[in-house]
Amino acid sequence: LAFLAHAVANVAVEKPEVHFLVIGAGPSEQEMEQIFTQAGVADRLHMTGVLQQQALIDALHAMDIFAFASCSETQGIVLTEAMAAGLPVVALDASGVREVVQHERNGLLIQEHTTAAFTGALKQITAATAQQRETLKQGAKATAEEHAMSRSAAKALQCFRALAEHQPGTPKGERDWEDALAWVKAEWDILRSMAEAGTAAVGSTLFATSEE
């Protein structure tokens, strides 16, 4: 998180319109405050604490850019949540990220994991024209739709239904089949709940916004 805070602070020093909104809570809060204080832009760091439901949605829609510096996002859920709000993403190239972020279509994917590279990407996206930003915004929304949890869960449910329609064979096969069906039912219940919810918790995540 300090890595990201340094990058955003670097941009904030040069661009007085840039603010950094942090959603969530964790042990890095004091370090981030120190980074922004030392850079002379402490007044542009905003920490909301943990937000849920409508408050989280409102915060996402108040932003212009989603800055993501984690290399451990295995499923890309956090990224698609941000993209659903029309936010282009600036993120490090990593597993789970590169499957979602498409360079210059819905954000910027940074190959070099350095503060300088991340700072440069943030400067690039904040300097984008209105048309370029609109293109990224629409690309983000399209990606969120493609990765919608409800759609993914529905596809999985279709597979389970197709599996359940088959009949068992031998007695041993029947026992194996009963075990398989028990597993399918458990997974089915989980996926159906996910499909009905259609959302995922974001948790402690950093968001950067450039206010116009």
Feature map (PLM): residue ranges:
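Short alpha-helical donor nucleotide-sugar binding micro-motif in glycosyltransferases
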Residues: 50-51, 58-63
